[in-house]
Amino acid sequence: MDLPPDSRTALRDWLTEQLADLLGEPLADVRALADDDDLLGCGLDSIRLMYLQERLRARGSTLDFAQLAQRPCLGAWLDLLACADRLSAPATVALPTAQDRDQPFELSSVQQAYWLGRGAGEVLGNVSCHAFLEFRTRDVDPQRLAAAAECVRQRHPMLRARFLDGRQQILPTPPLSCFDLQDWRTLQVDEAERDWQALRDWRAHECLAVERGQVFLLGLVRMPGGEDRLWLSLDLLAADVESLRLLLAELGVAYLAPERLAEPPALHFADYLAHRAAQRAEAAARARDYWLERLPRLPDAPALPLACAPESIRQPRTRRLAFQLSAGESRRLERLAAQHGVTLSSVFGCAFALVLARWSESAEFLLNVPLFDRHADDPRIGEVIADFTTLLLLECRMQAGVSFAEAVKSFQRNLHGAIDHAAFPALEVLREARRQGQPRSAPVVFASNLGEEGFVPAAFRDAFGDLHDMLSQTPQVWLDHQLYRVGDGILLAWDSVVGLFPEGLPETMFEAYVGLLQRLCDSAWGQPADLPLPWAQQARRALLNGQPACATARTLHRDFFLRAAEAPDADALLYRDQRVTRGELAERALRIAGGLREAGVRPGDAVEVSLPRGPQQVAAVFGVLAAGACYVPLDIDQPPARRRLIEEAAGVCLAITEEDDPQALPPRLDVQRLLRGPALAAPVPLAPQASAYVIYTSGSTGVPKGVEVSHAAAINTIDALLDLLRVNASDRLLAVSALDFDLSVFDLFGGLGAGASLVLPAQEQARDAAAWAEAIQRHAVSLWNSAPALLEMALSLPASQADYRSLRAVLLSGDWVALDLPGRLRPRCAEGCRLHVLGGATEAGIWSNLQSVDTVPPHWRSIPYGRPLPGQAYRVVDTHGRDVPDLVVGELWIGGASLARGYRNDPELSARRFVHDAQGRWYRTGDRGRYWGDGTLEFLGRVDQQVKVRGQRIELGEVEAALCAQAGVESACAAVLGGGVASLGAVLVPRLAPRAEGSMDLPAAQPFAGLAEAEAVLTREILGALLEAPLELDDGLRRRWLDWLADSAASALPSLDEALRRLGWQAAGLTAMGNALRGLLAGEQAPAALLLDPWLAPQAVAARLPDGREALARLLEALPTPAAGERLRVAVLDTRAGLWLDQGMASLLRPGLELTLFERSRVLLDAAATRLPERIVVQALDDGLLPAEHLGRYDRVISFAALHAYEASREGLALAAALLRPQGRLLLVDLLCESPLALLGAALLDDRPLRLAELPSLLADLAAAGLAPRCLWRSERIALVEALAPGLGLDAAALQAGLEQRLPQAMRPERLWCLPSLPLNGNGKVDRRRLAESMTRALGECRHEPSAEEPLEAHEQALAECWEAVLKRPVRRREASFFSLGGDSLLATRLLAGIRERFGVRLGMADFYRQPTLAGLARHLQVQTVEIEETQLEEGVL
């Protein structure tokens, strides 16, 4: 009948009829409900409410689910319907009956996910969506049980379904049995139990043979003593949870009284799917629009702590945690839920989400919620066994501090919103997110199966008893929450993947979950729903943070002046050849203090110290403190604009420099003048709480921020380290850290204050590892304190050149420490030398934590922070300032006695970063970290180093750790690259092979008589003409040329003709060289153009000389000729040998020889590419970055006079070593002495002298680079050396394979490059910004390379069309991955079906996962096609 909206009575009658039907309650009881009774408290759950909404829609209503759920009572619904149009009677539509039930039909979207997910190539695949149930009973009749199983199978088509190629088909009689019997009654009890455990482990994780129609298996094991163990193995491709209950019920009836079974259901699942798709088409379109609009704002999966990458688990196994709420607890919880107008499922779901939020790095995440939706107008649907599941994406945004009542209502609103748009299910939403480059995942499931009846139906319990145990698995699912009614209570069960989470984590979370629910049974829901930190974790942290301070409050400089008075003749500073005693240093400091006081400096003033490294710098610092002021260290190379910013921000009153300028702002005082003034009698008395120094660090806004640290704060840290190290007067400490880096605070006041001597490198030795090594050996340095990169530089020197055996302690801080560094350090130092890795922040007085390292345990991903130092404390907090549980990542906060006063003259920033709460004062570091279960702190990088790429949260430190964990990688730096779509890139430093043993023997030099004199004649001829020409010459260049002419005037030289003859030149060549130089000097071309000139490029000149020609010829002879069918890959470093590239390289183009040219200058590379044959590949080294695909790829590397182009020759050698495959060879030609002709052109480029190789040193450098050298040939001026590479074992394939084992796909860098070493900033830390800019530039150039879109072969083009049809986008790159272009498992299935249709070739999903690129799949397809043709030919012959 039609229902007019103004007929409230008729509408109410109709609504109550529907509710009575949906709830299974008597109509009279439902009609007795008041209009304002909350129907959710009367048993109306989300599923039934959805069914009601669909019945309303069938009558023309436009009310959506959210409107009905907002006020779930009859009165509110009648008000809503009163505003609507007339509700018409729906057309009676029975589900169609299939005409041919033997034909395959499509999978539902959930079935597709389960089917594809079980594939071995999927993440957490290799497992089916499966349930295993165990029951313990007695006296079961095996024959009757087997008959019951077969009876039920025949009644339900989906229990006879087979699954092939992404489709399903009903079999009349599957070939495999559905019953298994094991009779172990004669076994010993312990033997039977062992066998049962093995059988249970197997069956609980088995993949049934669904491709042969085996979707369930019922088993009976007859145990000793008369017990029977009944088990059921069910693949959930064929049945949802309600179907499982139906299966159990029918098994019970079929066993006890098969005659009581009703007629088998006539409805076919294929009919239901077709009808449902048509019925929901309009709703699906609306839901799709809803989800697409929300996509950019959707959160991701819960960021739970993981023990490993999910991809690394190849054979997932699950384990169950379970707890049963008692009948009383269940009733109380149900009553409270009804009072608050929420469903019981929402209560459990909200509690689950609160626990996830507590253990997740983010409180915003997605849950996967199965909706068991078997509603249809045809009542027969309730009798059908099949999988009617729809998956919903539920957005959880859990807020701290809100009551549970508020939290659960918010959770339910979100759930109802998801249900309202269920017609576009979770799988489609996630697929769209991937297509749009914003991938999300939802691997945590919340499933509620709280029906009115128990999970195990009475019909089954009567026959076999209640459930004893259960276990389930679902592909790609990390954690599956399940709820069931059992007995009089509710069973809570979590199934999680074994090994995916850290040990003990699921148990701790589950304990918190159960505890929360039990509190909710009895406590007021108006209280905040915050979960407390587990008590054991609270106690452990209190103990670690409660260590008393070691310090006695005093000023930083007090101890030094006391020691100077006690032993004035003891060494304080060792600098170059100088020795400065304590007394001398104290006197200089007091003189400087006197001068400052005379200039008006008063306690608390800020005085800048901007001096080169050395004794005067140290004296100035102590002088400033002795005057009562605080020092502000500024590097002498500080940019003027930044210097002015700092001086103004700090309120600097005076600056101690190397110049006098009283009129400057602030005034500059010359340190030498201060040293000539009268000295103070003693330091000005100061309170320990006074400011000691202000160190400026970079600010995120671009404005430097000055950290103001008191004497007491710094001395607390220093005393903790002095107590640990037992520093004494016999120690000598190498002060490599800059004054404006706070590690220098310990050097100055810890070292000198404890009586040790400081060994000071000079300013020009700030980055000279060789100078440090010499100082360590010379002065028997015992203590090292630096950033890790500086120690890496020191260890890069061969042991023969760097003896560090005097070191007894090494302190490292300020950056990541490579995991292998302790192992490399140990054999280079004194026996018993301890490595201490420290961390913290400038804002917390140098350091706040310590980890002493002997050996590195295999489970460490990086060197951890360790424990807080005495007098200091650490917290790991979430975004609301709550302490997070162990293993959960949060922001590190530092407290205790070493905290800075704040930021100098910036109270607003100080208030933001230094916060107070009930536990005290804390500095918010902006660093990410976590506590381990034993109380160890782990540092995980900066908060701003956690980045998002295509929607995925990525911790750059984890990417770097994964790279560094691979053999052959020394260090790494990852970054997000700009330039269009953001992507992830990384630079790695290959580890050099151990020092190689080559031959240091030198062959006799081949004589080339008279070459030097001949060159001198030609040089004089050219220079004379140029100096006489009307050219404007640079004064320095003119002077150098005149000096050379004067030096060569006394030499006896041959005639011009004789000189030309000796060199094998024509006069035209001399003219060409002179004209080229004249053009450059006249400004017709830029000086850099000479590098392209065939006459002036230094390498080109060398190649034109007789000994150069001979060296080149011998080099080419040393290249082997590839055998037929083989390839020889040759890399050439540097394009600056212009002439020989044009001629010599062309001669290298033999069959089988592949030539690649590497060059750091784009201009030179482009010019070379234009000149050279197309067969020669050119590769740019933008900013020196070598693309990782070239690692370990080449059989030979050629370097023709190219080493001088590098800042240090070892960089060029490291590049060559990285390019060579194992047993590859470097062929190197280098100049041993100056060539006047070559210097003609070089002088225009650079006024620095050309670096020339000394042959013994060159051979030693090669050996140090891990290349075994052998000199093949030499003249007096040039040498040819061959060096054998043992090989790094590092190549692109090995890198990718290693990353696949350690990182999920979204975290793997799309581009990898390598460098000989990572660039450092002024503080000795890795210069991340510079590297990110370099990688972005290199990526931009790569994207514009002509080869980026290569023409496709015909067979590739045909395959690309199949890709395009599925992906709905152009496909042009043969190496592009199907998945990087937006593909997923479902689209892969469609693609393989399209390939089968077009090419007649059947490819398996595993084949596709092995070759997911266009080129790889095309090759595989060709092989398959050939095999099919050969098979067909063979059959035709037979």
Swiss-Prot record:
GO biological process, one term: antibiotic biosynthetic process
Region (Condensation/cyclization): 136-442
E.C. number: 6.2.1.69
Alphabetical list of PROSITE patterns matching this protein: AMP_BINDING (PS00455), CARRIER (PS50075), PHOSPHOPANTETHEINE (PS00012)
Residues bearing the modification O-(pantetheine 4'-phosphoryl)serine: 46, 1385
UniProt entry tagged with the keyword Oxidoreductase: no
This protein's name: Pyochelin synthetase PchE
Provenance organism: Pseudomonas aeruginosa (strain ATCC 15692 / DSM 22644 / CIP 104116 / JCM 14847 / LMG 12228 / 1C / PRS 101 / PAO1)
